[in-house]
Amino acid sequence: MLNPFGRTVLRVSLLIRLAQVAFFGALMFTFYSAIVPPALAVQLAPWDKAEHFIAFYSLTVLAVAAFPGGHLLVIAALLSGFGALIEFVQGLSIVHRDRDFWDWVADTIAIASALAPMLLVWWRRVVASGQKNIDI
């Protein structure tokens, strides 16, 4: 589609679809990286907790872009649950990885860190609009 200036304009629905593809791709990559032997996993950072933070911060941003109508707290709960699922699977003997509660904590902190600025923007809009009741 061309705008009046002759430039191609992407439709919002196409951008959402691209974000969904990116999100599910990142979700699968994260799960794969979590269950393969450490020697085969892609290393994003020298510290394990930093890798968890990077992965789940990115997943959160992609999830919000992919599901713009989604409730932020639901997105947070689902991603935190995904992090817990990864830790559960890593604890299975067939995976040959170690379950670590602190990995899940790093995942959840990353999710909260990604959502915090979004929630602040939302809060500013609520306060500026003078709404008396809010839907959390």
Where are these regions (language model features)?
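Bulky hydrophobic segments
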Residues: 1-104, 108, 112-136
